[in-house]
Amino acid sequence: MGGFTSIWHWVIVLLVIVLLFGAKKIPELAKGLGSGIKNFKKAVKDDEEEAKNEPKTLDAQVAQTKVHETSEIKSKQES
């Protein structure tokens, strides 16, 4: 009684699928599923290649910001 080990379980499952989708629709569903998996694998591969080509570090300069003290701000607001 360990799940779907009997051939009759699989026959019933396949019969229900045929009844739900129809015999003509099943190949279309399988084709769509196959192309979806193929596109997913291609996208994963492209992302991995893109990650390999990206630089490891960024060569950028960080802008220094001036920190204003509260006394400087008050004097500027009063003038």
UniProtKB/Swiss-Prot annotation:
One of its GO terms (cellular component) is TAT protein transport complex. It comes from the Bacteria. InterPro entries: TatA/B/E, TatA/E. Residues 66-79 have a biased composition (Basic and acidic residues). Belongs to the TatA/E family. The Tat system comprises two distinct complexes: a TatABC complex, containing multiple copies of TatA, TatB and TatC subunits, and a separate TatA complex, containing only TatA subunits. Substrates initially bind to the TatABC complex, which probably triggers association of the separate TatA complex to form the active translocon. This is Sec-independent protein translocase protein TatA. It comes from Helicobacter pylori (strain Shi470). The lineage of its organism: Bacteria, Pseudomonadati, Campylobacterota, Epsilonproteobacteria, Campylobacterales.
